Amino acid sequence: MLSRPSSRFLSTKRGPGPAVKKLIAIGEKWKQKTTRGLPKQDTLNSGSKYILCQFPYPSGALHIGHLRVYVISDSLNRFYKQKGYNVIHPMGWDAFGLPAENAAIERSINPAIWTRDNIAKMKQQMQSMLANFDWDREITTCDPEYYKFTQWIFLKLFENGLAYRKEAEINWDPVDMTVLANEQVDAQGRSWRSGAIVEKKQLKQWFLGITKFAPKLKKHLNQLKDWPSNVKQMQKNWIGESVGAELVFKVADPKFENLIVFTTRPETLFAVQYVALALDHPIVQKYCEEMPDLKEFIQKSDQLPNDTKEGFQLPNIKAVNPLTKEEVPIFAAPYVVSSYGSAPSAVMGCPGHDNRDFEFWQTNCPGEHIKTCIAPFFDDASKVTEQERQRIIDTVPFTSTDGVLTKECGEHSGVLTVVARKSIMGMLNSEGLSKSVVRYKIRDWLISRQRYWGTPIPIIHCDNCGPVPVPESDLPVKLPELEGLDTKGNPLSTIDEFVNVACPSCGSPAKRETDTMDTFIDSSWYYFRFLDPKNTSKPFDREIASKNMPVDIYIGGVEHAILHLLYSRFIAKFLGSINAWSDPAGIFEPFKKLVTQGMVQGKTYVDPDSGKFLKPDELTFVNDSPDGNTVIIKSNGKVPVVSYEKMSKSKYNGADPNECILRHGPDATRAHILFQSPIADALNWDESKIVGIERWLQKVLHLTKNILSLEKDLAISKDYKTPTDLNDAEVKFHNDFQRFLKSITESFEVNLSLNTVISDYMKLTNILESALKKGEVRNEMIVQNLQKLVTVIYPAVPSISEEAAEMINSQMEWNQYRWPEVERTTESKFKKFQIVVNGRVKFMYTADKNFLKLGRDAVIETLMNLPEGRMYLMNKKIKKFVMKFNVISFLFHK
């Protein structure tokens, strides 16, 4: 057994060989030029392209997932620049947030210092991978020059009634001591950031009225033709449109207001047996003041599972069914969602026709009778036995929306549910007890965070005036500089000089808002700021934004389908509604085409006995295995279980992109990332396979050198056109080259199949190499197509392209950046004809494709004069002669 080198086992990795060292050196040689981009190309495409990848949080280190996104966006950026477009390809930093604050606490420094240091490191890493970003457009969300306008947007939302403060039940992260939006709590009830079990608290919070835009957010998804269907479906599900009715349940106690209950099935009113209220409902809160048992129930409710069926019946209070006038009990129930936004805070319970209500009733009222009001409908055509019919009728709950109302439903008895639904609504509408509405599951966006490192909310609280917006002339409300953070929670509330201010309205002593904004607000509008980053008077110029929006291609992870993408759509639509930008389509969508790249997964090794994840130094190779590549566990000689999983420190399967670039060079790393997987699919990272890419890059350089050595004085005019007098080999060479050139162009422009781009590059290289070896294609054509190859590889492997172009430029002048036009395929002027004698092919003859038009006698005479013709055709009497397509047939007398 012998340890052998592998990228997975860095401790045993040998250094690169001479050929790979050359690739690394070429990357370093051209780094400055390639990261600056390329000259503007003058072509027919004078329009613009806005290509944007989701900007990163400045953690200080890029991971392979980052690298994948940036290689995709940079390749598209370079391609469209070569096509002559004015490409906007900016980069910035999503710099506020908990990680920086927590890091600052650990180091006792200001988070701004930690953030700036990390940005400098990550910019250097981006340059190492040859990324060409518009650094003159760079933005950082923690800069006052940026968050000044985040605050401006908040004030506009406040001005339009879309930013408001109210007490609500919130998700509290006990580790980070801050509030989380619903989207930041996972299915297990844990914080997306700290992993802590989230608690429920009542707290005054700031919300943004995203629910007001819910109809447009849902409707306009249908017009996003270039978005992945799974992302659109996730947003539709999150928005959650329901068409139904708001019903008025009067409360049998005059000191309480009526209950507004939303339902999609008013026909089940005949079977309502209770009403359930959210824990923050005013009635529940009123009872809570007088009932310690209820208060304890609410306090413990955050420990219950999300689908809990526990409830607390409120004493001495009933709700009146608007249809039957029957009084039913009222429960406080954790399963009922809170009241902010468009979500209901009161629901009616029908145990006989809803599974959840059935379980709730059995939990809280065990053994009590269950009402039903809908029975299955069997028409004459129903092929159901009487026994089966009875079984269906006796099943409780009966949850089908199709059926007939039972005899207990008075004048509605025997009526189909769909008919009864309309008639019941008509009756209740006439009494003012119902109205048809569309409700949405989405709730208003909770943006308050009780932390320091975020955008301050520009509101001042005055005892006389209430919440007062900070005047625009006083923006930005700057974060006070702190040398070190030594506590969790909200340090802003402890800084008197920040908190204590005069009211802008009346001048009285007042208090500044100490909550900061959710960082998703910072990233909800950054794509606008990139277009006009130096503007000091407004977030962006209306004309500039209207000209360049929406973003043409937006690249990022599917994990942001609900959070960032939904919030960005909301803010873009809001800014459109206040005329901050115009959209000819009238839908104000920020991203035209969305590209969601798959996750990069690392090779993971697990001990088959213990299930323990194995570190690289716990593994070795077997050199006498059939493939010479079998990994075993050093301690016991067993073969580990191998799989590809999400990269993480705990699984020891991470990969450092900077190390990969140092070992293989930037071009090989870039091409390897593109080649390994289609963009939307997961990428199983295996650095050992990069050797194929390295060989191809070396072949490109060797091929360039060999082709240019054909004739030292060979020069190709800039206006060189493919000749028309091509031989068969040249026709095939030309057609094959154009076929792959077309495929590459379409892969960039149409289907973003960048993995096939790399394979097509390799095929073009092989076509040139084959033509050079065979010597059947004239040198000028080979050189011309070498130039095209060097040009089209530039988006993916820019420094190798530059190196090859430098060799070519030493002998001739040409535009190495302009993307070549795909030429039409051509046909040979010659054709191969089969010469058939008495039913058997005797020989082939290549002639002008119009050879048969010479006529019978001329064709026969020509063939007779050939050596093969004299052998097979001379001195024989023709019985039948046929010329058709590429066949010339002789039938001779015996």
UniProtKB/Swiss-Prot annotation:
UniProt keywords, alphabetically: Aminoacyl-tRNA synthetase, ATP-binding, Ligase, Mitochondrion, Nucleotide-binding, Protein biosynthesis, Transit peptide
Organism: Saccharomyces cerevisiae (strain ATCC 204508 / S288c)
GO molecular function: aminoacyl-tRNA deacylase activity; ATP binding; leucine-tRNA ligase activity; pre-mRNA intronic binding
EC number: 6.1.1.4
Family stated for the protein in its record: Belongs to the class-I aminoacyl-tRNA synthetase family.
Major location category of this protein: mitochondrion
Matches recorded under PROSITE patterns: AA_TRNA_LIGASE_I
Record GO cellular component, one term: mitochondrion
Positions of short motif 'HIGH' region: 56-66
Name this protein carries in UniProt: Leucine--tRNA ligase, mitochondrial
Motif ('KMSKS' region): 646-650
Key word Transit peptide present: yes
Catalyzed reactions: tRNA(Leu) + L-leucine + ATP = L-leucyl-tRNA(Leu) + AMP + diphosphate
